[in-house]
Amino acid sequence: MKLVPRFRKQWFAYLTVLCLALAAAVSFGVPAKAAENPQTSVSNTGKEADATKNQTSKADQVSAPYEGTGKTSKSLYGGQTELEKNIQTLQPSSIIGTDERTRISSTTSFPYRATVQLSIKYPNTSSTYGCTGFLVNPNTVVTAGHCVYSQDHGWASTITAAPGRNGSSYPYGTYSGTMFYSVKGWTESKDTNYDYGAIKLNGSPGNTVGWYGYRTTNSSSPVGLSSSVTGFPCDKTFGTMWSDTKPIRSAETYKLTYTTDTYGCQSGSPVYRNYSDTGQTAIAIHTNGGSSYNLGTRVTNDVFNNIQYWANQ
């Protein structure tokens, strides 16, 4: 059908109005779905919670450390399990130049005794994987998200924790994980900015070994601050604890970077320093490395709030 110019313009105007009306009907008829918060807490049982508080204050949030009693009496712990020696690493970490890590022999000293070796098993694989974690209260271990939730295998099936391990010596025994936590940004989106999590234990070793403090670094930049990374690397004698201390290299919104030497199985190690007002306090959670620096998930307001939520469960 051929339209004369006058009717062609009218027909075009009619179609334009019709399209706009249909678009309005669709947009107003179907409510828009709210964007999902990547910091939403999730657990291996499917429980979800939003512990974030939309905080914009530049004041630091601080949770203080506790040194514990340090006693090594066998009556204080939940048993002892020999952790497997064919342990696998989950994420690469780097030696930056010369390896300057030193072995921690006094693992019963604080804060080393609050540093935890993790032996992890996942569904559908016979391998055992290694990570590190650190206690933040009597029964809560903070670690990397990829230690509790593997992008290849899903949630861990079992996690065995050995505080203050020293080679074949377990001065505080071993504990089993009873609940695992991370956030949706990691478990659903695989976003390394949200690579952190926690483990609840079947006992309370923190009353004995103590726990690390943790804090945000909102009030002033952590760049240049001397910080340590302590954990259980897989390239050293099995089950031994090693540490290195260097300045923070850069501070991004979700990450801190540093040239501190680390290796596989140190994922989840505390990135910490001895603050004059709070003592041994973590400011990041070590996750992975590259050729020129290593990285950790920064303790932001949201990370702080989730750790507190998990600790209170």
UniProtKB/Swiss-Prot annotation:
Sequence ranges of Polar residues compositional bias: 37-60
Species for this entry: Bacillus subtilis (strain 168)
Propeptide position ranges: 35-93
Assigned protein family: Belongs to the peptidase S1B family.
Annotated GO biological process: proteolysis
Phylogenetic classification of the source organism: Bacteria, Bacillati, Bacillota, Bacilli, Bacillales
Keywords: Disulfide bond, Hydrolase, Protease, Secreted, Serine protease, Signal, Zymogen
Gene: mpr
Keyword Signal: yes
GO cellular component: extracellular region
Active-site residue numbers: H146, S267
Record keyword Secreted present: yes
Subcellular localization(s) per the UniProt record: Secreted
Leader sequence residues: 1-34
Uppermost EC category: hydrolase
EC number, UniProt record: 3.4.21.-
Disulphide bond pairs: C131-C147
GO molecular function, one term: serine-type endopeptidase activity
Region (Disordered): 35-74
UniProt name for this protein: Extracellular metalloprotease
Domain of life of the native organism: Bacteria
